[in-house]
Amino acid sequence: MAYRDQSLGELAIAIPRATKLFRELNLDFCCGGKQTLSRAAGKKDLNIDELEAQLEKLAAQPSDARDWREAPLADIIAYIIPRFHDRHREQLPELILMAEKVERVHHDKADCPHGLANQLTAIYNELSQHMMKEERILFPMIGQGMGANAAAPISVMEHEHDDAGRDVEVVKELTHGVVPPEGACNTWRALYSGINEFITDLMEHIHLENNLLFPRALRGE
């Protein structure tokens, strides 16, 4: 099957295991989910034929993941809030505390991620406001069947998703790709492991909203 002309977002929805492959190849399927596979692969100098073959194998594998394409929008929202919103509220404060400790204890080391705690704090503050607006304004509109009239708030949320994506790139730069240095202490390793988990969750979160919930809501489903 030819996948090259489909968008990354469409492929991530149709082939749930594709998200892991896209993350490994640094293909942005959440904020950049509207670009075609061919275009995204071209930007990264990836072999499109090999990439299509990999997706073909993934598509043939059985998956236990729920297919959200036909699920009621209220069910998607009911999944997003505890799985992602509440999880981010738990993750970030702990990551900030660990980042502060690592910066304090290892401030004199060359690989110390100076500024990481401040960057994570900024992400936490911005994401908290963002999620609150979704929960108080946008999600109730969608739940009441008013999604077709929600173009303005959806546009704002998508722009804030883009901002979150850029903030995550700063985190990656500060942490050398979120890879702990050789000999890093347990806290340092736990911090980077937690950041990687947060980034994975955030990408899945944005993907589900940008590529599935919002388009379906705008269509008046």
Curated annotation (Swiss-Prot):
GO terms for biological process: protein repair; response to nitrosative stress; response to oxidative stress. Signal peptide: none annotated. It is found in: Cytoplasm. Keywords: Cytoplasm, Iron, Metal-binding, Stress response. It holds the Pfam family Hemerythrin. InterPro entries: FeS-repair_YftE (IPR023742), Hemerythrin-like (IPR012312), RIC_family (IPR019903). One of its GO terms (cellular component) is cytoplasm. One of its GO terms (molecular function) is metal ion binding. HAMAP family: RIC_YtfE. Belongs to the RIC family. YtfE subfamily. Homodimer. Di-iron-containing protein involved in the repair of iron-sulfur clusters damaged by oxidative and nitrosative stress conditions. PANTHER family: IRON-SULFUR CLUSTER REPAIR PROTEIN YTFE (PTHR36438:SF1). This is Iron-sulfur cluster repair protein YtfE. It comes from Pectobacterium carotovorum subsp. carotovorum (strain PC1). The lineage of its organism: Bacteria, Pseudomonadati, Pseudomonadota, Gammaproteobacteria, Enterobacterales.
